[in-house]
A protein has these predicted regions:
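Alpha/beta catalytic cores of nucleotide-metabolism and tRNA/nucleoside-modifying enzymes
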Residues: 1-9, 13, 19, 24-25, ...
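Alpha/beta enzyme core
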Residues: 81-95, 99-111, 120-198
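Hydrophobic faces of well-ordered beta-strands that scaffold small-molecule active sites
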Residues: 13-16, 38-40, 68-72, 95, ...
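N-terminal small/glycine-rich loop or linker at the start of catalytic domains
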Residues: 2-14, 46-68, 101, 106-109, ...
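Active-site beta-loop-alpha junctions enriched in small/polar residues
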Residues: 18-20, 43-45, 73-75, 100-102, ...
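Short glycine-enriched, charge-decorated loop/helix-capping segments at active-site entrances
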Residues: 110-116, 241
């Protein structure tokens, strides 16, 4: 499978772009565990054009996480074009256009999934951005605005005609938000369309490597993107290593369009077997270290705490409430490290029934 100049092994797993989740520390760990492609948090085009520092900081990427995409969103054509040009200078391997975010503050203003109510504008933005940059441009969107407007089959053809290099489809409508079940049958229908010749990436409700394997088998997608199931669980990409799913070391980036050639063979993917709770705490501590080094102590801790709140490894620990509160209120690296080390000791002495 190939997106632009990026070649992947068979059945690659991608990390979905998620606000307040896919910071650099988390992306690097997902990459080490085998994510074939990672994405930054989504970036507001208008804020980027206005040089809002908190937005500009999201463009920070590392060669260790390649291939990496930067995702932008907005509803103004000129702002999206200018933002894409700014993003290109940051040196990602591709630019992704977000036409799928369902939250009110985005879709309610006509951006993200709001574009599903203004498809001519969506196509105009896509066409203009593709023409403005040299990098591959991809799109992430949903099945439609609601169940009465399931437009994805025709929309996929229209987006392909605009020149995009790949399309990611989340198997819900905007009206569903994240409720109900993702409908992969329509994703499979797009993939089977003989007119479609770009890679189709499926997304929605994948919680394990085994479920990803089933999606590949059943719907024939070119890649599977995993989102919420990765929260506090970057090792999900290292699970099911015998499933035939390709790992990050099996993909590479050719030196084209100003993008350096990166080898992933040096990235260590811990084994999925015998990967203990203590090992997983080591991963969370490593995430903390990277975030503090690459961002700063305050925001690095804030980003890491979000993953600590979501990680499944603390489920089932007796009398854990006060420890959780302390963990999520910690303000220094030393304080948070001490809490995690104390948890490690408790888990060693009193193992939980769940191994994360």
């Amino acid at each position: 499978m190939k997106i632009g100049n990026i070649e992947f092994g068979p059945r690659p797993l991608f990390l979905a772009p998620m606000e307040d989740v896919t910071d650099i520390g988390f992306r690097m760990l997902c990459k080490r565990f085998g994510a074939a492609m990672v994405y930054t948090e989504f970036v507001s085009a208008e804020a980027l054009v206005r040089s809002v520092q908190s937005t500009v900081s999201k463009l920070t990427i590392s060669d260790e996480e390649r291939p990496v995409g930067i995702q932008i969103y907005g509803r103004d054509v000129d702002a999206m074009v200018e933002a894409a040009r700014i993003v290109e200078q940051a040196g990602p391997d591709l630019i992704d256009l977000n036409f799928g975010c369902p939250v009110k503050k985005v879709a309610g203003k006509g951006a993200g999934a709001g574009m599903l109510q203004n498809i001519p504008l969506m196509l105009d933005i896509t066409r203009r951005v593709v023409d403005a940059v040299r990098l591959p441009v991809t799109v992430k969107t949903r099945l439609g605005w609601d169940s009465d407007h399931l437009v994805i089959t025709e929309l996929a053809e229209q987006l392909q005609d605009c020149g995009i290099a790949a399309l990611t489809i989340h198997g819900r409508t905007r009206a569903q938000m994240y409720t109900g079940q993702a409908d992969w049958s329509l994703i499979g229908e797009v993939k089977r369309n003989p007119r479609i010749n770009i890679p189709i990436i499926g997304n929605g409700d994948i919680t394990s490597a085994e479920e990803a394997q089933q999606a590949f088998d059943r719907y024939g997608v070119d890649a599977v993107m995993i989102g919420r199931a990765t929260f506090g669980r970057p090792w999900i990409f290292g699970e099911g290593s015998s499933s035939g799913i390709s790992r990050s070391e099996e993909c590479g980036v050719r030196s084209e369009n100003g993008v350096s050639s990166i080898s992933h063979s040096s990235l260590h993917t811990p084994p999925s077997t015998n990967f203990t709770l203590s090992d997983k705490i080591d991963v969370l501590l490593e995430m903390l270290r990277i975030n503090v080094e690459r961002i700063d102590e305050y925001r690095g801790i804030l980003h890491t705490r979000r993953h600590l709140a979501a990680t499944p490894i603390f489920k089932g620990i007796p009398d854990f409430r006060q420890t959780r509160i302390a963990m999520l209120r910690a303000e220094t690296v030393d304080e948070l490290t001490a809490i995690l080390e104390d948890i490690r000791q408790r888990l060693t002495e009193q193992p939980t029934d769940y191994n994360g």
